[in-house]
UniProtKB/Swiss-Prot annotation:
Task performed by this protein: Plays a role in androgen-induced proliferative arrest. Required for maintenance of sister chromatid cohesion during mitosis.
Region (Disordered): 1137-1412
Main location class: nucleus
Biased composition, class Basic residues, residue ranges: 1402-1412
Compositionally biased intervals (Low complexity): 1139-1149, 1156-1167
InterPro entries: ARM-like, ARM-type_fold, Pds5
Residue ranges, compositional bias (Basic and acidic residues): 1172-1184, 1196-1212, 1223-1241, 1263-1272
Protein name: Sister chromatid cohesion protein PDS5 homolog B
Compartment(s) of residence: Nucleus
Ranges of biased composition (kind: Polar residues): 1350-1362
HEAT repeats (start-end): 383-419
Length: 1412
């Protein structure tokens, strides 16, 4: 080396052979040529060439001079760089340059030349590649480690390489760059932050997207150097995350993006960083937490991520953010769930509980995204979501917000179509989600028009897609209908009914538009538009759009003709689709992308277009039924037993025969139905008869061969078929045959002659047949019918107890256990009622006599002869039959007028009967009559007595019934402003006088000033007033107050001279007045109008008499607590199984706002089936929660009563029942007047049978559950058995020395007299009633209230306390239903979270007989 140094010091530069001196004196081209030769020389040299190394040392030094390093020509610079790279290779490990500054200049120079790599198409690229390869292979830059400015050199190199890499480079370029950079990291002592930044910056999303190759280069570098670089990465994140030193790097703001990228590159890079994220998840800074949550969502959710299993503490900490207080964080967590479910099914279990809480989040967007996450995963693969997750979606179909409900419903529909309809995952998957079809249809029970329209759309697109070929579509519908639950079937039937009704409304509108324009037609058109508007979303806008559409129809004949075809009964499915397409095309405007008018009309067209059913469809459906009958169908493959399929198919056809009767008019269809009539299955034959009745109007003229074959079958069914078939056979004859009188005579005569009172088995069908003939043709058989009723029905059947009943302690038994004699008696009562409903007059006093007979049955507890032969369950049945018969007759104006007040009051007591089923079914029939506006308003007052029912859920249902009936009347008055003459019979507030009068005559109300009895009266009054006063519309509070004041100025018309009776009346008025004063702040205002009191109930006010006395005892004041009435739109209780309805929620939701799905103007009693949640989220939010119905009654305390009082009131009934002697058997129907005399004398004495009353339990929940388990073991006999004590009647009310006078028929209320109620309507009602009564039999008998065994209180003077529990089946049929648009039954699968059975808090009244 000494020699070489000498040579260098000599300063003489030796050039390779053939190369002349290279200086600034030669041209650029010559310089390049010479340099190329130098390059070639150095390239060929290796490290072992010591002589050459020494020879060219000065040349090496010369090439590093500023002349070359700063030369303006790039080719010169490139060649010099290649020389220098080879020089470093040849002279390694010692470089010929010793000056640090010179070394820095050289390496910065080489780095600058590397920029030439960028242009891969350059002719010099290979030389640039050589340069890169050389310095990478030799690791030339490692020389710089000793330099002070090494960091600057390395940083510049890294920046250069990252900036030049592009997709034109091959793998070798990439590899050499990685080699070059990795050697610097792996062999150096440290990695500066600046250098680290040059690598990490390429991972930032913005840079990553700009230069994917730089990202790949950084990724490869980090993978190669993971172990060496990890401490520096850790230090960087520690500085930024833990110490907050964001100034150390410009990348501080991208720290979370970097963590994600680094984790994806190599998780080992973050071994020490991930624990720091746990602290960040608990940061107080919302935005910071959000950033960490977003980061971890990507890390945990990535496809192959194992982070959750590797770092469980971090996973648990992350799950905790699902409950974060900051909304965007919770939203982010929920969005992450779908990726996690799809990529990591094993984590579904961990997520389920957190998603459950979030599905009840107060934020709409979060609840919405929970659904989206679950549905997205389910649509990818059903196995990814468990049943719990699907249930969360199911719950949200009842959410308060439409957007959430819609998402949930559409999600379920898509899942159903994919896995059930298209069977994409096999039968097991289809079975798992079989509940979806029922659930979606149950939503049709909702009150919101949006929900119902969406159900219709889902049905047409996802459940039975309308674009399927006809046979396929009908097969789909056939098996769907066969597998739906009963409530879903009712919903589907209602859907078709609503669509059909709307179709008729639109048809009427088109007909009106076609008429010449007059004021009358304009009014009719407006009225029709209003009706149609109510069937569309957003009634305000819909009204404007419908007016516009009406104008379009008037002006555009083509659109009108298309619409006319669409609503025609003969319109086929294909035609319907064409019409809809044409109308929307004509109304559309290409320039207007969003057209709300067109959207609204589309809604209308969707509802009225017959896209499923036409003549071809009915024919295909009949063929499908025939296949099942022949055994050639795929019933078993579809998972439906053949019998069930046939029965469901006929039921489906029956429903369609109501909505699409014209589509049945084909010989093939009628022949198939005729074959069904002859089948053994009673239900199938019944349905076939009903289809004939609905569709057979043209059979006689168009299908004579069908007529000939059908007639003998109908005769046979009417005479000897099962009762229901006999009934339908009579109605078929009435609908089909013009010679019906002849046919009726041929049936009536032989049946009439063959009636045998001793042959019970063969009496029921004749009685049913004769009853329906009497209803349809009362004049044809007037004389024989009157004789038949007087002699046979009354004398031979009702007044005779031929067989002793079975001894049992039960109060109710299933139908099959009822004695044949009682079943005959029930049919005899129904036959009398049908006869009277057919006559529609009381000219022969038959109605009066029948009412006396019915009230006598009620009065005698169902044992008309009072011989004690009838069993208790049979007596219950007869009481129910009598009570129902009176309610039925009261719906006919001519009979309502002759029902005396005593008879009405006695009938009302049926709602407090000791037998639960009697109360339940009677209330059902009462509710139906009221909701159809058939029963007079005074019958709504009977609902007040439901406050005395010991079963909390019965009270809750009664309340819902009241809400519906009040709303029905208010809605009717809104829509029919011109019915002011009916105001007395429709305005709900007018129920108050009837309620006051009924409660004043309540047999429980014995002592005028008795506090306990008055508290009972108060509860009954509040039961009605709470709902009436919920809204103070039109100053109704003042109106009610004025009404009560006016009553105090009158006397009781039932006993105007009875001082005690009048005092009771005034006392009840004072109770009502105190309730009004305590619950209203506007009661003292001027009443909007002077109330009119019913003359049958109250005398005219005496102008000389001013009754200002307060009749209440002073201590009663404390029981009137001030406060506003609860909102009437309490949703949910009526839709739950009775085991949970009415229970108070433990969450804050019970004291927060309750809002229905519908708008505030909609009927609030919709069966929203909204459950009460017992759990609340960690934040007390309630916006999305569903609400339970609190009991209408507050908890009551046990009575304190003197023993003397008790002993006096507990005496057994002392009323003597006059025996019916043999001579009385000769009574005609008119002789029943005598029978009524005793009844009138003791009419006020009969106390209602009371169910066992129970007191509230103050025991803890675990004690309650323990008792529950004990009670479950009790036998059914014990559940239904009457009270253990002897029955206690109520002390008789004093009679004022005579029988009350019968009200003459002329003294009628102002109820409107619709004389002609069609027999068909009556028959339809009866059919529905029979179905509902049948439903009662399908329930478990655990419905009765059972008294638990409690120790008696030792202290004297206290009454016993008993705890009652309702362990009722969730399958029980609810009697009081809310304003379901479908039917009076409501689906009961809506309990979304199980609730514990709570103690029913009801006071035990010692003055009353125990209730069952």
């Amino acid at each position: 080396m000494a020699h070489s140094k000498t040579r260098a010091n000599d300063g003489k530069i030796t050039y390779p052979p053939g190369v002349k001196e290279i200086s600034d004196k030669i041209s650029k081209e010559e310089m390049v040529r010479r340099l190329k030769m130098v390059v070639k020389t150095f390239m060929d040299m290796d490290q072992d060439s010591e002589e050459e190394k020494e020879l060219y040392l000065n040349l090496a030094l010369h090439l590093a001079s500023d002349f070359f390093l700063k030369h303006p020509d790039k080719d010169v610079r490139l060649l010099v760089a290649c020389c220098l790279a080879d020089i470093f290779r040849i002279y390694a490990p010692e470089a010929p340059y010793t000056s640090p500054d010179k070394l820095k200049d050289i390496f910065m120079f080489i780095t600058r030349q590397l920029k030439g790599l960028e242009d891969t198409k350059s002719p010099q690229f290979n030389r640039y590649f050589y340069l890169l390869e050389n310095i990478a292979w030799v690791k030339s830059y490692n020389i710089c480690f000793e330099l002070e400015d090494s960091n600057e050199i390395f940083t510049q190199l890294y920046r250069t390489l990252f900036s030049v890499i592009n997709n034109g480079h091959n793998q070798k370029v990439h590899m050499h760059m990685v080699d070059l950079m990795s050697s610097i990291i792996c062999e150096g002592d440290t990695v500066s932050q600046e250098l680290l930044d040059t690598v990490l910056v390429n991972l930032v999303p913005a840079h990553k997207n700009l230069n994917k190759q730089a990202y790949d280069l950084a990724k490869a570098l980090l993978k190669r150097t993971a172990q060496a670089i990890e401490p520096y990465i850790t230090n960087f994140f520690n500085q930024v995350l833990m110490l907050g030193k964001t100034s150390i790097s410009d990348l501080s703001e991208h720290v979370f993006d970097l963590i994600l990228e680094l984790y994806n590159i190599d998780s080992h890079l973050l071994l020490s960083v991930l624990p720091q994220l746990e602290f960040k998840l608990k940061s107080n800074d919302n935005e910071e937490r959000l950033q960490v949550v977003k980061l971890l969502a990507k890390m945990f959710g990535a496809k192959d991520s194992e982070l959750a299993s590797q770092n469980k503490p971090l996973w648990q900490c992350y799950l905790g953010r699902f409950n974060d207080i900051h909304v965007p964080i919770r939203l982010e967590c929920v969005k992450f769930a779908s990726h996690c479910l799809m990529n990591h099914p094993d984590l579904a279990k961990d997520l389920t509980e957190y998603l459950k809480v979030r599905s009840h989040d107060p934020e709409e967007a979060i609840r919405h995204d929970v659904i989206v996450s679950i549905v997205t995963a389910a649509k990818k693969d059903l196995l990814l979501v468990n049943d719990h997750l699907l249930n969360f979606v199911r719950e949200r179909t009842l959410d308060k917000r439409w957007r959430v409900r819609k998402e949930a419903m559409m999600g379920l529909a898509q899942i159903y179509k994919k896995y059930s309809l298209q069977s994409e995952a096999g039968k097991e998957a289809a079975k798992q989600i079989s509940w979806i079809k029922d659930k979606l249809l149950h939503i049709y029970y909702q009150n919101s028009i949006d929900d119902r329209l969406l159900v219709e759309r889902i049905f047409a697109q996802y459940m039975v897609p309308h674009n399927l070929e006809t046979n396929e579509r009908m097969k789909c519908l056939y098996y769907l209908y066969a597998t739906l639950d009963s409530n879903a079937v009712k919903a589907l039937n209602e859907m078709w009914k609503c669509q059909n009704l709307l179709r008729h409304q639109v048809k009427d509108l088109v007909d009106l538009i076609k008429q010449p324009k007059t004021d009358a037609s304009s009014k009719a058109i407006f009225s029709k538009v209003m009706v149609i508007t109510r069937n569309l979303p957003d009634p305000g806008k819909a009204q404007d759009f419908m007016k516009k559409f009406t104008q379009v129809l008037e002006d555009d004949e083509k659109i009108r003709s298309q619409l006319e075809m669409l609503v025609s009964p003969t319109c086929s499915c294909k035609q319907a689709e064409g019409c809809v397409r044409e109308i929307t095309k004509k109304l559309g405007n290409p320039k207007q992308p969003t057209n709300p008018f067109l959207e609204m009309i589309k809604f209308l067209l969707e509802r009225i277009a017959p896209v499923h059913i036409d003549t071809e469809s009915i024919s295909a459906l009949i063929k499908q039924v025939n296949k099942s009958i022949d055994g050639t169908a795929d019933d078993e493959d579809e998972g439906v037993p053949t019998d069930q399929a046939i029965r469901a198919g006929l039921e489906l056809l029956k429903v369609l025969s109501f909505t699409h009767p014209i589509s049945f008019h084909s010989a093939e269809t009628f022949e198939s139905l005729l074959a069904c009539l002859k089948m053994d299955d009673e239900k199938v034959a019944e349905a076939a008869l009903q289809i004939f009745k609905n569709t057979g109007s043209k059979i006689e003229e168009d299908f004579p061969h069908i007529r000939s074959a059908l007639l003998p079958v109908l005769h046979h069914k009417a005479k000897k078929g099962p009762p229901r078939q006999a009934k339908y056979a009579i109605h078929c004859i009435n609908a089909i045959f013009s010679s019906k009188e002849t046919q009726f005579a041929q049936i009536f005569e032989p049946l009439h002659k063959s009636l045998d009172p001793s042959n019970f088995e063969h009496l029921i069908t004749p009685l049913v047949t004769i009853g329906h003939i009497a209803m349809l043709a009362p004049d044809q058989f007037a004389a024989p019918l009157k004789s038949l009723v007087a002699t046979f029905i009354v004398k031979d059947l009702l007044m005779n107890d031929r067989l002793p009943g079975k001894k049992t302690t039960k109060l109710w038994v299933p139908d099959e256990e009822v004695s044949p004699e009682t079943l005959v008696k029930i049919q005899a009562i129904k036959m009398m009622v049908r006869w009277l409903l057919g006559m529609k007059n009381n000219h022969s006093k038959s109605g009066t006599s029948t009412l006396r007979l019915l009230t006598t049955i009620l009065h005698s507890d169902g044992d008309l002869t009072e011989q004690g032969k009838i069993s208790k369950p049979d007596m219950s049945r007869l009481r129910l039959a009598a009570g129902s018969a009176i309610v039925k007759l009261a719906q006919e104006p001519c009979y309502h007028e002759i029902i005396t007040l005593e008879q009405y009051q006695l009938c009302a007591l049926a709602i407090n009967d000791e037998c639960y089923q009697v109360r339940q079914i009677f209330a059902q029939k009462l509710h139906k009559g009221l909701s159809r506006l058939r029963l007079p308003l005074e019958y709504m007052a009977i609902c007040a007595l439901c406050a005395k029912d010991p079963v909390k859920e019965r009270r809750a249902h009664a309340r819902q019934c009241l809400v519906k009936n009040i709303n029905v009347r208010r809605e009717y008055l809104k829509q029919h402003a011109a019915v002011s003459e009916k105001l007395l019979s429709l305005l709900p507030e007018y129920v108050v006088p009837y309620t006051i009068h009924l409660l004043a005559h309540d047999p429980d109300y014995v002592k005028v000033q008795d506090i306990e009895q008055l508290k009972d009266i108060k509860e009954c009054l509040w039961f009605i007033l709470e709902i009436l006063m919920a809204k103070n519309e039109n100053n109704s509070h003042a109106f009610i107050r004025k009404m009560v004041e006016n009553i105090k100025q009158t006397k009781d018309a039932q006993g105007p001279d009875d001082a005690k009776m009048n005092e009771k009346l005034y006392t009840v008025c004072d109770v009502a007045m105190n309730i009004i004063m305590s619950k209203s702040t506007t009661y003292s205002l001027e009443s909007p109008k002077d109330p009119v009191l019913p003359a049958r109930y109250f005398t005219q006010p005496d102008k000389n008499f001013s009754n200002t006395k307060n009749y209440l005892p002073p201590e009663m004041k404390s029981f009137f607590t001030p406060g506003k009435p609860k909102a009437a739109n309490v949703l949910g209780a009526v839709n739950k199984p009775l085991s949970s309805a009415g229970k108070q929620s433990q969450s804050k939701s019970s004291r927060m706002e309750t809002v229905s799905n519908a708008s505030s103007s909609s009927n609030p009693s919709s069966p929203g089936r909204i459950k009460g949640r017992l759990d609340s989220t960690e934040m007390d939010h309630s916006e999305n929660e569903d609400f339970t119905l609190s009991s209408p009654l507050p908890g009551k305390k046990t009575d304190k009563r003197d023993d003397s009082d008790l002993s006096e009131l507990e005496k057994p009934r002392g009323r003597k029942k006059p025996a019916i002697t043999d001579s009385e058997e000769k009574l005609s129907i008119d002789d029943l007047n005598k029978l009524g005399q005793d009844q009138k004398l003791r009419g006020s004495q009969r106390g209602r049978k009371r169910p066992a009353v129970v007191s509230e339990s103050d025991e803890t929940q675990w004690q309650e559950e323990k008792r529950l388990k004990e009670d479950v073991i009790e036998s059914e006999d014990e559940q239904n058995s009457p009270p253990k004590k002897g029955r206690r009647g109520r002390p008789p009310k004093p009679n004022n020395g005579g029988t009350p006078k019968e009200e003459p028929a002329a003294k009628s209320s102002k109820r409107s007299k619709k004389k002609q109620t069609s027999a068909a309507a009556v028959e339809e009602e009866e059919e529905e009633e029979e179905r509902q009564t049948e439903n009662i039999e399908q329930k478990p008998k655990g419905r009765q209230n059972r008294s638990t065994k409690r120790t008696q209180q030792s202290r004297a003077g206290r009454s016993k306390q008993a705890a009652s529990k309702e362990n009722e089946s969730s399958e029980e049929m609810d009697v009081f239903q809310s304003s379901s648009p479908v039917s009076d039954d409501v689906p009961q699968e809506e309990v979304m979270e199980e609730e514990e059975v709570s103690t029913i808090n009801v006071r035990r009244r010692t003055s009353k007989r125990e209730r069952r």
